[in-house]
């Protein structure tokens, strides 16, 4: 029988056989693969050694990121002195081992396995989404028979609904169990398994429900056949019609690497792009499926100007002239300080740089990107930008981790994956959080409390650190520690952080957006300093690290240079309304102050929206809308939590009248005669940006810390938490993500004891502000508090986190 094409091409690529060389390293062994001598680490599997030298061994169940299962047997090879072929994925190398992957014995075994795998596989290739990129197709071409000898009835498996993201055709399943192992080992949710045995084995969920992990889309990539496919992409295009464009995810501060697959400029799907330093070979669901919002009906596609309360389409020169005239009038009559610039967290570094130039060029220092932040009292003590203390990949090697106001599963899913890897290696994980989040790892100790109690827990932790290390707390923090009550849990956390090195403290978005964030941050930094732990401040929005560096804060300009007269921060710009606002890449849902934003902006004489989406609320408030491109539609630079700078090119085409934000600002700045807006193209702007990103001129000072007096009002303490799929305008418009079981629903989450205290049960309605919300009984909520999802249209009218609220039963 002729040698398969796959095997033949591999054989041709090998070098001339050589004799084995002596062992040099004690932890290595000498082996031979198809006459090719090499040294490999002890404990390596044959398939790993073969991959190292480019020898292709067919496989279905093996994946280098998953535990070995040896289910499919497709990788059978001949090992000299072994009585039968051995699975290359599960056979460890041994000194002097000689392996043959192309011998007649090996090829016969592989062909036989291939025949068995195809016995029950349907001939769906013409209608299967996997066609053209299917591992089974590829291997069958090399090792399959042209005619099947099987004449019995094929089995048929009923499909299961795994939710809005993953389509199932389980008759195609070959039982490789990649999806099962991914859920068990990587996602940590164990939602999929094999039921039955032999030919009756079926892969499915244990209790027949949708998958709830935030990493579920990865099983689409792992599936070697068409059993699990992308439901959003289903039947939309063939792989050979698509062009792969390198890009990044922009919904958290990790900036996972990905490819956007486009057809004629339209995004069809997203798949992971390997980068071991950031996302390995995985992708979160929100980075994978959010692209469907690029063509949402809410997209702003033409410049529009409001005249006499009526919206009309305008051309770009007319819209720019409108903005120029109104800004000139307001700044001339009322002063430049009457301009407030509020920008979202998904803008590019170029956008932040030019917004900083534009605002300060007009004479206003009122610019901020921290729309969800409530406490700005330690601004002058901050470093250049929030970032990790060490490479992201090092987190998985930590021996102790403290999560402070951090839910890495939802804040940054692939950061949560790193924490899980550390836990699996024996790391002890601790938490001080506003809720008992459903982690995919176990906590050694936890302090769960509502917003007021979290401050007490942080102070107790800092005091325990001071006592354990015999170190005096900083002058600004010391007075607050006097009355702190140190618990055994706090002492245990400190002892573990000191004893288990390296250790890390992950300071998350729930801490950064706390009404006493400065105190929490000071406590975390002090604990890190005395225990030797790394202090990792995770940026709470996608490109916050770039926004800080490019001066999108009121007290610093580019490179962290302090300004002589700091402007108003985001909260002050709302509490002290301005006459003119520029809203760039931001919606009302992005603010912590909710209804106060509506009231403040409604009073303005001119509201300029530079954004990608419009809705009735924005149309009511705005006077001019300048449609801007989304990150996949334009070039831009992004800085992730580790400080890695990545510049991407446009992957998809924007509508004809949509412009990149930096282009809009360039024309607007030039029209207004401001300095720094005359450059010919993106290359010139990027060169300036590169120089600016290299600067670190921040001079952190000291700050005064205080804790608000504890409220003794009757009621429950509110904690507003932004949902995993509500963090930005794009995610809020991704229909598939909003249909998942982990997407937040408008509800009040109450501890059972508190629900009993106010006389409500699950499903009952309560009034919160102007909203009427259903009650959900949730034991993860601390007693004395309640949780509400922020970022939703129905929860805009919320008091701020930490407010004491009396819920009214309907």
Model-derived segments and spans:
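A cross-kingdom feature strongest in bacterial/archaeal respiratory oxidoreductases
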Residues: 2, 57, 62, 338, ...
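N-terminal export/assembly segments and adjacent metallocofactor-ligating motifs
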Residues: 2-12, 16-45, 51, 59, ...
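Long hydrophobic segments that form regular secondary structure
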Residues: 264-281, 286-296, 300-306, 315, ...
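Short, structured coil segments at secondary-structure junctions
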Residues: 362-363, 425, 441-443, 523, ...
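A generic structural motif
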Residues: 364-378, 426-436, 530-546, 604-615
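Short alpha-helices
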Residues: 434-435, 441-474, 517, 526, ...
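Phosphate/pyrophosphate-binding active-site segments
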Residues: 444, 455-512
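A glycine-rich, hydrophobic/aromatic-adjacent loop/helix-cap motif
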Residues: 503-575, 719
């Amino acid at each position: 029988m002729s040698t398969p094409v796959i095997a033949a091409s591999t054989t041709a690529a090998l070098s001339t056989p050589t004799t084995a060389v002596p062992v040099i390293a004690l932890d290595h062994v000498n082996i031979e693969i198809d006459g090719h001598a090499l040294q490999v680490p002890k404990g390596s599997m044959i398939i790993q050694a073969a991959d190292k030298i480019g020898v292709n061994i067919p496989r279905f169940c093996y994946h280098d990121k998953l535990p070995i299962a040896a289910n499919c047997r497709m990788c059978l090879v001949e090992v000299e002195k072994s009585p039968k072929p051995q699975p290359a994925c599960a056979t460890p190398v041994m000194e002097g081992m000689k392996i043959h992957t192309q011998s007649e014995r090996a090829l016969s075994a592989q062909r036989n396995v291939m025949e068995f795998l195809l016995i029950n596989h349907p001939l769906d290739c013409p209608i299967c989404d996997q066609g053209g990129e299917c591992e089974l197709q590829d291997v069958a071409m090399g090792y399959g028979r042209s005619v099947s000898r099987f004449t019995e009835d094929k089995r048929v498996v009923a499909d299961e609904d795994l939710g809005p993201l993953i389509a199932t055709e389980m008759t195609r399943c070959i039982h490789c169990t990649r999806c099962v192992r991914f859920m068990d080992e990587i996602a940590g949710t164990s939602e999929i398994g094999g039921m039955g045995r032999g030919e009756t084995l079926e892969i499915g969920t244990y209790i027949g429900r949708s998958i709830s992990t935030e990493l579920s889309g990865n099983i689409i990539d792992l599936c070697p056949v068409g059993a699990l496919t992308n439901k959003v992409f289903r039947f939309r295009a063939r792989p050979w019609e698509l062009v792969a464009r390198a890009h990044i995810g922009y919904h958290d501060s990790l900036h996972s690497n990905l490819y956007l697959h486009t057809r004629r400029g339209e995004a069809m799907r997203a798949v992971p792009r390997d980068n071991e330093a950031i996302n390995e070979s995985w992708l979160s669901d929100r980075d994978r499926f959010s692209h469907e919002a690029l063509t949402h009906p809410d997209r702003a596609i033409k410049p529009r100007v409001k005249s006499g309360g009526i919206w009309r389409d305008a051309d770009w020169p007319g819209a720019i002239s409108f903005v120029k005239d109104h800004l000139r009038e307001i700044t001339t009559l009322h002063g430049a300080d009457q301009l407030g610039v509020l920008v979202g967290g998904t803008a590019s570094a170029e956008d932040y740089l030019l917004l900083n130039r534009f605002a300060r060029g007009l004479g206003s220092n009122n610019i901020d990107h921290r729309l969800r932040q409530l406490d700005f009292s330690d601004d002058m003590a901050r470093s250049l930008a929030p970032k990790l203390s060490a490479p992201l990949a090092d987190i998985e090697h930590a021996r102790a981790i403290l999560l402070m106001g951090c839910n890495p599963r939802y804040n940054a899913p692939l950061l949560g994956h790193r924490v899980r890897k550390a836990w699996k290696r024996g790391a002890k994980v601790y938490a001080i959080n506003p809720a008992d989040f459903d982690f995919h790892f176990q906590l050694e100790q936890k302090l769960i409390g509502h917003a007021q109690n979290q401050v007490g827990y942080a102070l107790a932790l800092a005091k325990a650190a001071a006592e354990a290390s015999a170190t005096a707390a900083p002058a600004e923090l010391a007075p607050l520690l006097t009355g702190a009550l140190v618990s055994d849990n706090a002492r245990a956390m400190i002892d573990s952080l000191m004893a288990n090195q390296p250790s890390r403290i992950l300071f998350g978005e729930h801490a950064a957006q706390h009404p006493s964030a400065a105190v929490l941050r000071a406590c975390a930094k002090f604990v890190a300093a005395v225990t030797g732990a790394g202090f990792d401040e995770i940026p709470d929005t996608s490109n916050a690290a770039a926004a800080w560096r490019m001066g999108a804060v009121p007290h610093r300009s580019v490179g962290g240079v302090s300004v002589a007269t700091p402007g108003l921060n985001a909260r002050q710009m709302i509490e002290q309304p301005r006459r003119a606002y520029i809203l760039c890449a931001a919606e009302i849902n992005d603010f912590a102050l909710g209804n106060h934003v509506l009231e403040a902006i409604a009073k303005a004489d001119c509201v300029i929206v530079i954004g990608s989406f419009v809705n009735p609320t924005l149309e009511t408030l705005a006077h001019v809308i300048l449609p801007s491109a989304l990150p996949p539609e334009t070039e831009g630079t992004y800085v992730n939590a580790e400080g890695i700078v990545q510049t991407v090119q446009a992957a998809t085409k924007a509508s004809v009248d949509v412009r990149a934000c930096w282009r809009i600002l360039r024309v607007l700045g030039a029209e207004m005669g401001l300095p720094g807006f005359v450059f010919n193209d993106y290359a010139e702007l990027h060169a300036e940006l590169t120089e600016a990103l290299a600067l670190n001129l921040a001079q952190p000072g000291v700050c005064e810390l205080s804790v608000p007096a504890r409220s003794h009002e009757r009621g429950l303490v509110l904690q507003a938490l932004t949902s995993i799929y509500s963090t930005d305008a794009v995610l809020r418009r991704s229909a598939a993500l909003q249909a998942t079981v982990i997407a937040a629903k408008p509800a009040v989450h109450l501890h059972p004891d508190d629900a009993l205290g106010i006389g409500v049960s699950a499903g009952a309605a309560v009034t919160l502000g102007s909203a009427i919300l259903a009650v959900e009984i949730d034991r993860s909520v601390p007693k004395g508090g309640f949780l509400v999802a922020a970022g939703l249209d129905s929860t805009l009218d919320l008091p701020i986190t930490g407010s004491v609220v009396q819920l009214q039963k309907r």
